[in-house]
Amino acid sequence: MVGNVFFTYCILIALVLVFFSTVTVECVVVGASMRPKYNNDTKKGNDTVYVNTLNKVYNYGDIIVINVQDRDPIIKRVIALPGDVVDVVFDENDGYKLEINGKLIEEDYLLIKHDEENILNQKGLYTTFVHFHGSLKENHPELFMRSGKLVVPNGEIFALGDNRHDSKDSTYYGTFKMSQIAGVVELERKAGEGEFKFYWNYVTNGKFFSTIANCFNK
């Protein structure tokens, strides 16, 4: 009896893993643009993400993998969706911040570099501000209104890296077409975490149900 249950469980795990490998693509995260979310512990190596290529619905805060010309795919966070109005503004209390549709947004996932002599800029988005109102506006004037604010075109998204001090994202490339998006990050495996433990947790925690549901997001 116990043997039959164990055998059935092994078959179930095998089927789940086959399904997982079919709908996701394994990507190794390279670089520091998404710290502290990924590659925060440089001594251990690079983190790995699993991208659901069937999930075509993108929400604020989703982490996505984007195909860009003449280089490897990049990993960024969705900041604004089609029709959204984006700006980078100066707030007296918090420094430079993102403004979406007239509202300042809180980004607790950002990498904050501590710099006592320049804490206002480091805590805010000074680098993003410079790129947004400088090279981006110069290279992609079609994205901007006369007010200086950016409007995300239909069928495109505005995405940024969490480490704004070291990220080539929409402030560099402009908005990304949705056809460039390889998929949404479904799961992550931290550097040093064994594959067996990762897959075991994926199955036993029932996370594969979320993967199945996300496959039907069109």
Language model regions located:
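Hydrophobic membrane-insertion alpha-helices, especially the h-region
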Residues: 4-22
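Soluble "head" domains of membrane/secretory-pathway proteins
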Residues: 7, 25-28, 37-218
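Aromatic-capped interface at the extracytoplasmic side
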Residues: 16-35
